[in-house]
């Protein structure tokens, strides 16, 4: 037991830390250029906060021992925690709030999947107290900027609309509606066909819903014929305007697939929902996900006052995997700029002084001192293996002999 980390967790060694740090640093730089400020919330939250008023399944939360104040757990995502903080701690600040984060999250695996990963690393943004077309477009264009800055290969955004999908599902009786919804979420056409529909009209409508994915213009033309409610027609028009805005901002078509069967894991989404995927070397990976949640903030308001919000989270592990075969990630942990070697016990003070001088002269330099026990040949072999750039041999009188490798 003591030789391995707990099931579902893993250690990150220096090269992987360097590469994922490179990804995170570039993402945070993009976030800041778009005006987002970093927020840090607690890893441990009240279970009521994490389940976001019933929107998140409590079974996905790794719960901790409760006390007299209630149950707590490890956050399975950041949106609920940031929404709580924004409503309760930042209510006096001007709106909108543009917040970003980089953090780990924890999710309990499903029954029968012991050993599955439980700790994940994410980076993302939340645009709070602002609704409408421009906010939706900002989030999607920011997401695209993130992928462009990392040179992610073959990425696409799959876009749905939670409110529109709910409207299209409304003709189905309640028990059947949930079954249809599940089949759509799992892309399970066989089960969808075999559901007990009360009439052939609903069966045909379920088939149409299943196939509402593809080129945005084509899908919007199909769904316009199905959208009977006024709210659904409004959602269709908003999607048309959003697609036009996204395409107008880029030199070529925005890499977008419209999929009205897209249903996210977290049920607090009320407007657009989306997943970002990369099809690299015939492996489809989910790089990120997000959407609009215009009711979630009200869960944390003392009077239940709702406010709009939208955001996304990026999966650092999947981004890392998608970039490994390319040329952008660092291929090694940052090497030392200088290795200082004291030549004798009486040279130790002079060596520390030389190291301090180098660090003070350039705060970005990486400087270490050889701790002894190796011959000159062994030191040079070590330096070459570690790609150390410079050696400095320090004499007892403080004189230094430098060499570049």
From Swiss-Prot:
One of its GO terms (molecular function) is histidine-tRNA ligase activity. It is found in: Cytoplasm. One of its GO terms (biological process) is L-histidine biosynthetic process. CDD domains: HisRS-like_core. Belongs to the class-II aminoacyl-tRNA synthetase family. HisZ subfamily. HAMAP family: HisZ. It comes from Microcystis aeruginosa (strain NIES-843 / IAM M-2473). The gene is hisZ. Keywords: Amino-acid biosynthesis, Cytoplasm, Histidine biosynthesis. It holds the Pfam family tRNA-synt_His. Heteromultimer composed of HisG and HisZ subunits. Required for the first step of histidine biosynthesis. May allow the feedback regulation of ATP phosphoribosyltransferase activity by histidine. This is ATP phosphoribosyltransferase regulatory subunit. Pathway: Amino-acid biosynthesis; L-histidine biosynthesis; L-histidine from 5-phospho-alpha-D-ribose 1-diphosphate: step 1/9. GO terms for cellular component: cytoplasm. This function is generally fulfilled by the C-terminal part of HisG, which is missing in some bacteria such as this one. Signal peptide: none annotated.
